[in-house]
Amino acid sequence: MKRIHLCVLAGVLATACASSKPDYSFLTNDQWAAELRKRGVDPQFVSNPLTSTSDMKETAEQLARPGGPGGPVEKLRNLQSGLFDETQFPFRYQNRGTFTAAEAFYRREGNCLSFTNLFVSLSRSIGIGTKSAFVTRRIPTERDGDLIIVNTHVVAVYFEGLPKPYIFDFDRRPHERVEDAKPLDDLWVTALYLNNRGADELRAAHPEIATRYFEYATRLAPEFVPAWGNLGVARRRLGDLPGAFEAYRRALERSADDPTILGNLASLYRFVGKESEAQAALAAIDLSRATPHVLVVRGDLELIKGNVSGALRLYKRARRQAPATADPWVGMARAELARNHPERARNYLERALTLEPNDPSALAFRQQLEEANRRARNTAK
């Protein structure tokens, strides 16, 4: 699938933390393993994403300079600055590659989630109680064929005794300013780690491994909708269509108008020959929440229905959100060809292939366009 981040409302964080439920934050390794077993997850097959080592504590003390002036926030700022300074901490940031905090520390590489978990683990090792927080803005997705994989983004938060939380963001890519986030306990952090690991395995064409990761994620955080959606994708890849439908049902129980879930459900309905159900699922999508890839899928539906201008509007909207992604450009090319504008279609296609030369949908449309040109030449003869 194609392409799953510093101020937060204090009230939102306080509400998210105020609960009569048990708090699974700041678990020891033994406590963490015991909680996993209670939920049917074998800790022998799952690494604790927040575990620290003595080497990590030593590095944290050096970067945060806890012996110097300043309180916890000052130390956290120093720690973040040190992690961003390649002369102090060489680190290769990558969009993919989900590691535990310890793995990211020793490998000196990882994605946003890995980097955030590393920061949380390092700060906890020197006695500062930070948490990871799930960003609740539009969730990033990736498209693979006719399915959409959901990624997640987290930040680190610290708000002990403070009127307003401090947010530490480790996504090095351009992105929207974080306006809302949900603090996570250690089981939720593990679920996010497993969800991202599952997405990595799906990209590597290992759906059986991905399925196990997603199933574990849903056991640790049953309300985590993206994990249910990704479980549906993985089960479909394995040919378990009833299991895929069940995963999407569980997701929609928790978020009835989730655009990505509805888009993948529509794809599954279409795969089994239920076109009316597929169109109903797509029509139920709340376009105000839709990711670029969901907008493209919705545009495809309008194109199939013959609403070319409506499809083109959706493709252009997707392009505005993700101008460096091939999908919207391919959609626009298809719409222009349907409007009998082959030259404009060719220009859009060239733009898509410039952005992503190996994009399957762009390559397939290029072949379609070449065949259309051959037919036109033969007709002219």
Mark where each language-model region is.
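Secondary-structure boundary elements
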Residues: 40-104
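Long, contiguous interaction/recruitment modules in multidomain scaffold/adaptor proteins
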Residues: 92-228, 242-254
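Canonical tetratricopeptide repeat
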Residues: 196, 230, 264, 297, ...
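Single-residue signature of alpha-solenoid repeat helices
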Residues: 210, 244, 277-278, 311, ...
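Canonical positions in the second alpha-helix
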Residues: 216-217, 250-251, 281-285, 317-318, ...
